[in-house]
Structures are given as structure tokens and as C-alpha cells.
Design a protein with these regions (language model features):
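Extended, loop-rich substrate-binding clefts of extracytoplasmic carbohydrate-active enzymes
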Residues: 2-54
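Intrinsic-disorder/low-complexity, polar/charged segments enriched in Ser/Thr/Lys/Arg/Asp/Glu/Gln
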Residues: 24-28, 44-46, 57-59, 142-144, ...
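A short, structured loop/turn motif at beta-sheet edges
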Residues: 18-25, 51-55, 86, 174-178, ...
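Acidic, contiguous internal or C-terminal segments within carbohydrate-active enzymes
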Residues: 33-80, 206-209
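Active-site pocket scaffolds in enzymes
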Residues: 151-209
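Targeting-peptide/extracellular-domain and disordered-appendage signature
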Residues: 76, 82, 88, 199-206
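Active-site/ligand-binding surface loops and adjacent short beta/alpha elements
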Residues: 83-84, 88-160
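Membrane engagement elements in two modes
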Residues: 9, 30, 140-141, 154, ...
């Protein structure tokens, strides 16, 4: 599959409920996805989603554990895709960008003329663009990235830790009918498995890790 089998495996609901901190109520749900194969990996993803009642923040915590007995490679990338109405002509990509370190669309960029900060409306015959940015962090080591629509007063911000997700990509698919922008924090470069191994950057999980 395009991004690994885990994306098409149903989760098993392992719990849900309400927890309290003083007079603050938090709703939570937790699920487990198991990806396993004979002579292959046995990985378990535990995801917890939590929201404080009355807030506009959703907190998601993922933990991947190797339940098998083979040393197993581990790569992780989120695809946080935002579309209309937040994404429209004039929407802004806001992030603590220090530098552009890689782009996947050098052959088409000059003709398309779309940069990484200000977004146009839906395009015809648009070829997807992917930017990798070197990001700064706040005092807690976090990287806040947002897509903001000033006209509507709407936006979405995703915050991750740079020590957990050192790579961050902006995916632009501005083609009419598929119009979306992806905020994509990743443990590795999107060149994939082979590149991570060749560079000595692959994360390996042993049993119980």
C-alpha cells in the first residue's frame, strides 16, 4: 500500500471515558492497531485521543511497540490534510521556518509559481508540490505549524516535538477537485525505507521497545 499496511487495518477500541482535573473535564478514547505477519513484523500502535470539554484543542498520543521477536525497522509520518473552507485563495501557511532544505517539485515549480507561504485557489493541471523545511522550536522543543484563513477567521494548528519528528513537510495538492494542503511531521525523510537505511538513519525496534 502507499504508506504501509497500518493505514488500512481497523483499530480495536480498548477504552474510553471521562477524566477530571479539578473542575476540568476531559473526554478520551483509546484504540489499538496490530500489524503482524508470519516471518515478519509484529507491531502494535496504541492511539489515545483526548479533548477538554469546551476547548478547541485535540491531543493525540501514539505509541508504537514491537511485540515480535525480530528487530524491526520503524518509520512514522503523519498526513494532516486540510481542505476547504480553511484552505482557499489567500490562506497562509505559518511556521517557524529557518530554511528550505528539500523540494520534490523542482521540474514543475517555475511553471506553477506557487510558493510555500501564500496559497492560491484551486488550480488546473497542478502537479503536487512537497517542501521540506528546517524548523525552529519554542522553549519546550515544540514546532507549531498552522494553516490560517484570515478572511474567515479560521485556522488549524498542529504542534509536534522536533526531537520526535525531526523532518517536517508541506504537501500541496492544489488541483481542482482534490484541493488540499498537508502538514506532515515525520521521523525520516520521505525518500523512504531505502534512503533511511543507506544514510544510517533507520530506527530499529527490538522486542518490547
Amino acid at each position: 500500500s502507499l504508506h504501509g499496511r497500518v493505514g488500512t487495518i481497523p483499530a480495536r477500541l480498548s477504552g474510553y471515558g471521562t477524566r477530571w482535573e479539578g473542575d476540568r473535564a476531559f473526554l478520551w478514547a483509546e484504540g489499538v492497531v496490530t500489524q503482524a505477519a508470519v516471518f515478519g513484523e509484529h507491531l502494535e500502535l496504541t492511539r489515545r485521543i483526548e479533548v477538554e470539554v469546551g476547548s478547541d484543542e485535540i491531543r493525540m498520543t501514539d505509541e508504537v511497540t514491537n511485540r515480535g521477536f525480530y528487530k524491526t525497522p520503524h518509520m512514522y509520518c503523519y498526513h494532516i490534510n486540510v481542505g476547504h473552507p480553511v484552505l482557499e485563495d489567500g490562506a497562509r501557511y505559518i511556521a517557524p521556518i529557518r530554511d528550505v532544505v528539500w523540494a520534490a517539485h523542482a521540474d514543475s515549480y517555475d511553471g506553477q509559481g506557487v510558493g510555500y507561504r501564500a496559497l492560491p485557489g484551486p488550480q488546473t493541471d497542478f502537479h503536487e508540490q512537497v517542501w521540506q523545511h528546517e524548523m525552529g522550536t519554542d522553549a519546550e522543543g515544540e514546532v507549531p505549524v498552522a494553516l490560517v484563513n484570515d478572511r474567515l477567521g479560521l485556522g488549524l494548528m498542529a504542534t509536534t516535538r522536533k526531537d520526535q519528528f525531526p523532518c517536517l513537510y508541506e504537501w500541496q495538492n492544489l488541483q481542482a477537485g482534490q484541493y488540499a494542503l498537508g502538514i506532515e511531521p515525520s521521523t525520516h525523510h520521505v525518500l523512504g525505507n531505502g534512503a533511511a537505511r543507506d544514510r544510517g538513519e533507520m530506527i530499529w525496534l527490538t522486542h518490547g521497545q
